[in-house]
């Protein structure tokens, strides 16, 4: 799993771990970093099958995604971190707080739930990726993420590019993990 540490690189520094959403990379958080206070350690990582992380054959499970997050934290000697999770990143944070409470002091969860959608929704999304590719999926995702007026601005281009360039195998693998979570 590919991760990056920004800010203070010391285990005793207050730590924030960021886990991103399906189809995105750790670059998702880049505009947030300058807004954070000095003196903290910031850990971002690419989910399994995303960005610079390995892309193993799927399907993946939520347990694997949670174990990946734990491995990132263990490798950086994290204890007592604030975990910020967006969408599937929030699902991972919830699981990590249950399985490894030694790692988590606080959770910040956005656009997430204990279960997102149903099996049919994820089966349809997987089929759409196989049939139409990631560029078509990115169009669908942008329409869901952004309002119509904002979606037609150049500010959306980096987001569109991020999802369009996601590896289909990794995207589908994480879709399966979300579908299998209850």
Which role does the model predict for each range below?
Residues 2-58:
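Conserved HGGG/HGGXW glycine-rich cap/lid loop of the alpha/beta-hydrolase fold
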Residues 65, 83-85, 110:
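Short beta-strand immediately N-terminal to the catalytic nucleophile in serine-hydrolase-like folds
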Residues 117-120, 131-182:
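Conserved alpha/beta-hydrolase catalytic His-Asp/Glu region
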Residues 91-99, 103-139:
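Flexible "cap/lid" loop of the alpha/beta hydrolase fold
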Residues 46, 82, 105-108:
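Residue in the alpha/beta-hydrolase core beta-strand immediately N-terminal to the catalytic nucleophile
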Residues 20-22, 81, 85-87:
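Conserved alpha/beta-hydrolase "nucleophile elbow" surrounding the catalytic nucleophile
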């Amino acid at each position: 799993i590919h991760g990056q540490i920004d800010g203070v690189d010391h285990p005793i520094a207050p730590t924030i771990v960021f886990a991103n959403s399906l189809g995105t990379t750790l670059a998702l958080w880049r505009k947030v970093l300058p807004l954070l206070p000095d003196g903290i350690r910031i850990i971002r990582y690419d989910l399994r099958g995303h960005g610079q992380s390995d892309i193993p054959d799927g399907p993946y499970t939520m347990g694997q995604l949670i174990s990946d997050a734990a491995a990132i934290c263990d490798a950086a000697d994290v204890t007592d971190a604030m975990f910020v999770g967006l969408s599937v990143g929030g699902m991972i944070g919830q699981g990590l707080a249950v399985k490894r409470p030694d790692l988590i002091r606080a959770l910040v969860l956005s656009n997430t739930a204990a279960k997102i959608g149903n099996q049919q929704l994820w089966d349809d999304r997987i089929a759409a990726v196989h049939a139409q590719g990631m560029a078509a999926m990115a169009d669908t995702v942008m329409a869901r993420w952004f309002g119509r007026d904002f979606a037609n601005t150049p500010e959306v281009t980096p987001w569109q590019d991020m999802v369009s360039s996601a590896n289909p195998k990794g995207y589908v693998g994480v879709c399966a993990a979300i579908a299998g979570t209850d």
